[in-house]
Amino acid sequence: LGVGRGGRVTRLSLPARLEGCYLGVSDLGLDGDIPGFCAEALLHEAKKQNMRGIFADIEADSPAARALLGPLDRLMHEAGLPLFVPLRQAGAVEHALLVAETAISGGSLDGYFEELQRQYPGRIAATLRPVSADFRLPAQDSEGHPLTEKERRALQHTCGAQAFFSRELCAKYFTYMDERQNGHFVLYDDRSTLEAKLRRLDALGVKHIFALYPDVAALL
């Protein structure tokens, strides 16, 4: 389902009828006054379709988002159904599970999730999002320049760079110098690193892990 301006709920098409899954809720321009029955409608739909819970994939930190997620959090908790929201919505909910991304470019994957679990005991889930980015050194941000797999392979071949595994980031990387002698750091995931991340998360006790199909097709 999608939720737009004024809490309008729109049914998005799926290739097949699904039961026993999680109901996904997308942000379709969520804005304005959000009536109380909007959260009730989402819970009703989850029950009607025999869903296991709801994943409200709403990233915006806005009054409208909080007006929807707060009541939805309460209703889902009372109904005994899990609600998942992005980590950045932690301040808008009291009971929902918080979904953190595995695509990090600094620090330690284990340390990151261990700290989150200390902050929110029993409430941390994960989304397995492969990283593939080129960072010019010194890095100016945590996102870098995104690369497709084809672009990354071509770049590595052209530079003749050797790839290494970072235990801290649980990802592979290589470095190279561009034509202006600027240093670059390319960080990426492949099947082996995604499998390693799943093992790490399992060892850390993270029980709920989400992923988009195209991102993890190699694992299936």
Predicted regions and their residues:
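Extracytoplasmic/secreted proteins, especially bacterial periplasmic and envelope-associated proteins
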Residues: 37, 41, 67-71, 108-111, ...
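Acidic/aromatic/glycine-rich contiguous surface patches that form carbohydrate-binding/processing clefts
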Residues: 197-220
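Conserved, mostly hydrophobic/aromatic
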Residues: 56, 126, 201
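Short acidic, glycine/proline-enriched helix-loop-strand junctions
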Residues: 64-82, 163-174, 178, 218-220
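Active-site region of glycoside hydrolase catalytic domains
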Residues: 66-67, 74, 81, 111-138
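Glycan-binding loop/region signatures in secreted carbohydrate-active enzymes
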Residues: 123-197
